[in-house]
C-alpha cells in the first residue's frame, strides 16, 4: 500500500519512473549493507549461503543508487530518500542482531522492504 501511495502521489506519469528506479536500486543496496554488517544468524539457510560481500561490492551497491538518485532526482531529494533508507535499514539491522543474532534471508528481504517503504513515504511528502 505504501508503494501504491507513493506512485499515486506523483501526478505526472513520466516523473514516476525516476523515483521507481531509485527506490528499487537503493532498497537492494540496503540488503547488501545488512549482509556486510550482520553475521549470519544460522549456519545453514539463505543468509549464510549468500556469504558476506567484500568492501568493493558494498561500495558499488551503495554508491550506484546514490549517484542514480542525485542524477535523476537532485541532491536534496536524493539525500532525503537515501537518509530514510539508511535510518530504516540501521534500525532493522539493530533489531535483527538483538532478536535473531544476525541476518537471515528473511531479515535481508525485510530490510529491503522497510528501506523501500521508508523511501516511498518520503516521495509522498516531497511531491
Region annotations inferred by a language model:
Residues 1-127:
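Hydrophobic alpha-helical transmembrane segments
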Amino acid at each position: 500500500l505504501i508503494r501504491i501511495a507513493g506512485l499515486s502521489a506523483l501526478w505526472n506519469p513520466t516523473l514516476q519512473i525516476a523515483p521507481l528506479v531509485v527506490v528499487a536500486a537503493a532498497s537492494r543496496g540496503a540488503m547488501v549493507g545488512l549482509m556486510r554488517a550482520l553475521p549470519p544468524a544460522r549456519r545453514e539457510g539463505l543468509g549464510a549461503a549468500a556469504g558476506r560481500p567484500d568492501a568493493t561490492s558494498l561500495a558499488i551497491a551503495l554508491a550506484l543508487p546514490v549517484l542514480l538518485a542525485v542524477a535523476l532526482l537532485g541532491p536534496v531529494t536524493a539525500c532525503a530518500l537515501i537518509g530514510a533508507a539508511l535510518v530504516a535499514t540501521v534500525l532493522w539491522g539493530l533489531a535483527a542482531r538483538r532478536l535473531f543474532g544476525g541476518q537471515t534471508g528473511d531479515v535481508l528481504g525485510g530490510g529491503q522492504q522497510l528501506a523501500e517503504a521508508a523511501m516511498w513515504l518520503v516521495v509522498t511528502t516531497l511531491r
